[in-house]
Regions:
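Flexible "arm" and connector segments at domain edges
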Residues: 1-60, 64-105
């Protein structure tokens, strides 16, 4: 992996997280950061399962921040990735909203 550099566009959430944490996250490395991300996903799962509405905002924020950090550590612009994949609608049927015949979960 290349040295840490800011990849999030100016004004983006990813850039904000880079400005706050990039040096520390780069020192920890992608593998260590991935472990923190997985832990936060676990906390989000727990809040959802327990229907802890008061914790959802915090846990979603944490997961979003750690995901942005992981993208940055890999030199990827998270917003550009999302727009590339979903900017034209559903990646499978290309419709907005999706018209795929997905079975109900």
């Amino acid at each position: 992996m290349s040295p840490a550099r800011r990849v999030g566009p100016e004004g983006s959430f990813q850039r904000l997280i880079e400005d706050i944490y990039l040096e520390r996250d780069a020192a920890r490395g992608a593998q260590g950061t991935l472990l923190w991300f997985v832990e936060e996903v676990g906390e989000l799962v727990r809040a959802i399962r327990r229907q802890e509405r008061h914790n959802l905002e915090e846990e979603f924020g944490d997961v979003y921040a750690w995901l942005a950090t992981l993208a940055s550590l890999h030199g990827l612009d998270l917003d550009a990735i999302g727009r590339k994949k979903y900017g034209g609608g559903c990646p499978r049927c290309r419709a907005v909203p999706c018209n795929c015949p997905h079975p109900a979960a």
